[in-house]
Amino acid sequence: MARNKPLGKKLRLGAALKSNRNPPVWVVAKTKRRVTRSPTRRHWRRVKLKA
């Protein structure tokens, strides 16, 4: 990908990077492991973004 990106695309990629995280440990502890993984997790090679 080009180093010089449009600002809108850069913001969308940054938001996707931040949202691609595990739930915090305190959430897993508070829900007694009922919530262990995020339904919105995305693997960089399997699922591509429409950014």
Swiss-Prot record:
Entry keyword annotation includes S-adenosyl-L-methionine: no
Region feature (Disordered): 32-51
Gene Ontology terms: biological process: translation
PROSITE patterns (alphabetical): RIBOSOMAL_L39E (PS00051)
Alphabetic keyword roster: Ribonucleoprotein, Ribosomal protein
HAMAP family assigned to the protein according to its UniProt record, in alphabetical order: Ribosomal_eL39
UniProt record similarity statement: Belongs to the eukaryotic ribosomal protein eL39 family.
Protein name, UniProt field: Large ribosomal subunit protein eL39
Organism: Pyrobaculum arsenaticum (strain DSM 13514 / JCM 11321 / PZ6)
Gene name for this UniProt entry: rpl39e
